[in-house]
UniProtKB/Swiss-Prot annotation:
GO terms for biological process: mitochondrial protein processing; mitochondrial proton-transporting ATP synthase complex assembly. Pfam families: Peptidase_M76 (PF09768). The gene is ATP23. The lineage of its organism: Eukaryota, Fungi, Dikarya, Ascomycota, Saccharomycotina. This is Mitochondrial inner membrane protease ATP23. A divalent metal cation binds at residues 150, 154. It comes from Yarrowia lipolytica (strain CLIB 122 / E 150).
């Protein structure tokens, strides 16, 4: 198979463009060691006082800040634990990592980051910084696996084809490939979301739907009509381009 992409190649979904996770900065929080925050009985006492209105306004603000720090810390720990497991044991993720390294890319825990995201994305890819996993939106280990596999397809495309992420056809093609190959559009996922009305073409409809939504987020895209047109133009070649896989496995 030629190294030339079958259309112009594309990019990411939990994305934002240009191949970037367009996540807004999370609200600024002070740098605090979570172990220094109230815990055990004292944290329970503060929680009860907060819920029953026995805190002053100043105490309530401090409690809400402490609670947010605790929640984000717990999210981060869970995301990091699942990330490490998936990168070590997921056949899809390990295969993609090997394929990326074969074409000169370098992907490891050092450029796959867990962080809090304000927009409703599961993750994103940036050609300079790597992969972002949105710790507050990834619901489970399997969801993280699908998200990481999706973004790794973008990473692969960017490394192999030198994608221009502001080119809507490039972006659309990689989005189609990422949704098709990552497993996020497999039948069970769609059934659980209640979106698989027609079993025979559910996978394709899912990949197309997700690609259109991602292209719509590209600053160079005018509206849904343009995104739909671009996705349709590259659909056949990009959906059938399963590199680096032999076929659609998930």
């Amino acid at each position: 198979m030629s190294d030339k992409p079958t259309e112009t190649v594309s990019v990411s979904e939990s994305v934002a463009t240009p191949a970037v996770a367009a996540t807004e900065p999370a609200p600024s929080l002070p740098v605090v060691n979570p172990s220094s925050l109230p815990s055990g009985f004292e944290w329970w006492r503060q929680t009860m006082a907060y819920k029953t209105g026995f805190m002053s306004a100043e105490e309530s603000v401090q409690y809400e800040q402490d609670r947010l720090i605790k929640e984000r810390y717990a999210e981060c720990l869970s995301c990091e634990k699942n990330k490490q497991w998936v990168m070590a044991y997921s056949p899809t993720v390990r295969f993609m990592k090997d394929q990326i390294e074969k074409i000169g890319g370098d992907i490891s825990s050092n450029n796959v980051f867990c962080d809090h995201c304000d927009d409703f994305k599961a993750g994103g890819f940036h050609p300079k910084y790597g992969i972002l996993v949105c710790q507050n939106h990834v619901k489970s280990r399997s969801h993280l696996e699908d998200t990481l596999a999706h973004e790794m397809v973008h990473y692969y495309d960017n490394t192999k084809f030198k994608v221009d992420w502001m080119n809507l056809k490039h972006h659309a093609c990689s989005e189609i490939r990422a949704s098709t190959l990552s497993g996020e559009c497999r039948m069970m996922n769609e059934l659980m979301k209640g979106k698989l009305a027609r079993l025979t073409r559910g996978h394709q409809e899912c990949a197309k739907r997700r690609a259109i939504l991602s292209v719509m987020a590209n600053p160079g895209c005018k509206d849904e009509a343009q995104a739909t047109q671009v996705v349709n133009e590259v659909w056949d070649s990009c959906f059938n381009d399963t590199r680096p896989f032999d076929t659609i496995y998930r």
